[in-house]
Amino acid sequence: MNTNSTTVASSFLNDLKTQTADSHKKLEELPVSMSIMSPDMKIEEYAKYLNLMHDVHADTEETVFPLFSGLLDDLEQRRKKQLIEADLSYLNCDVTSFEKVFKTENISIPFALGILYVVEGSTLGGRFILKNVSKVPQLSGDKGVSYFNGYGDKTGSFWKSFLNFLSEYEQQNNCGDAIIEGAVFAFDSIYNHFESR
């Protein structure tokens, strides 16, 4: 990438972050979101959050991932539904019945990239959440926290790799508005899902 391309990519990523900030903040302020950052977090709250995120990842893997087959080299490594299932199993909690989160049809690749931006961003944020949930004795060590562990010590590099792919795709296809629209849609859809359950 030359300097001009890097500037354009940085500008787009800044716009994406800025234009999704309100939706992101609104989601983080929901009681269920705040519960997992509480020093008094209960295992029941943790399991509820995991079940909600299971729906998010199940829908992403079913609806969004197929659009990136052959485009995103490390797509299979980005699956997280099984990590949530392993954590819930460790806690002797059932996976609740699946509920669709992203209720829309005919998702374009740019729109889907916006959704994936939010879902991948949650993995990066999960590393911060991990610090809190790991304080619960039942979750200490590596048991019950595989979802929030994300990609382990490679989480940062996976995020950078995704942002590079996102930026290059946006530059080549001039589709920033659709990506931003997809990201806002994802934050709002997850918010509605969390609030309804």
Where are these regions (language model features)?
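Metal- and O2-centered redox machinery and metal/ROS homeostasis
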Residues: 1-197
